[in-house]
Amino acid sequence: SAGSMVSGIKHSLGLAGISAVFGILIGFCVAYVLTYSRFKLKKLIDMLTLVAMAVPGVVLGIGYIFVWNQKWLTKVGLHLYGTPSILVLASVAAAIPMINRMLVGGMAKIPGSLLTAAQMQGAGFFRKIRTILLPLLHNSSVSAVLAAFGGSVFNLAITTILYPPNYSTLPVYISDSYNDLKFGYAAAATMVGGAFIVGIMMLLEVVLNAGYRKKQGH
């Protein structure tokens, strides 16, 4: 029904928004460590991010079931399987590797000597990030956020495995309609949902770039 489709779109948008926000925060921190730090285990972290991108969503979803469906987790209030929380966690985890690789590529173009020079002039860590790294990484950051947002909305593998009862998402609604031979509903949901998501992504790009240009103008 139309109500189920709207509900699925709302849930998917919520998951995608959370994934993009938390994904960019965590992905930025990981990318900074991989690019500029002397952390001894950064090669291991780099390898893990690459492996996470290569693992199929179905495998990740099954892994989340095994991890978060343990009896002892109920006693400590962390039994997330069968709740929307596990979808949030899985969506964020799926978005981080992609965001991280895009930011690593952007940071590779920014020499560490810029940050070192700023530090020698008395700039603190957060000031270096705010005045040097973030402005130069603007395009990469916007691309990473939009890619994570769009990818999370249509993440069929994870959502079909982990979605709780009475909690539909757009990919689940499309898949269920197709399996029930309701091809018209599936096609309509794909077109309407896709157009809606593309519109939101275009609006986000305009807003993020407009804010950056306004700041640069001052």
Which ranges hold each PLM region?
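Transmembrane alpha-helices
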Residues: 51, 55, 93, 100-103, ...
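Periplasmic/extracellular loop-to-transmembrane helix junction in inner-membrane transport proteins
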Residues: 1-21, 180-181
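Membrane-interfacial helix termini and adjacent extracytoplasmic/periplasmic loops
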Residues: 3-6, 37, 41-44, 58-92, ...
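Internal alpha-helical transmembrane segments of multi-pass membrane proteins, especially GPCRs
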Residues: 10-18, 47, 85-88, 129-134, ...
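Residue-level recognition of pore/gate-forming positions within transmembrane alpha-helices
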Residues: 50, 66, 91, 151, ...
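Interhelical loop and adjacent transmembrane-helix boundary motif
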Residues: 1-4, 153, 159-205
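C-terminal transmembrane helix and the adjacent membrane-cytosol boundary/short C-terminal tail
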Residues: 33-34, 41, 104-115, 119, ...
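Hydrophobic positions within alpha-helical transmembrane segments of bacterial inner-membrane proteins
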Residues: 20-28, 32, 58, 62, ...
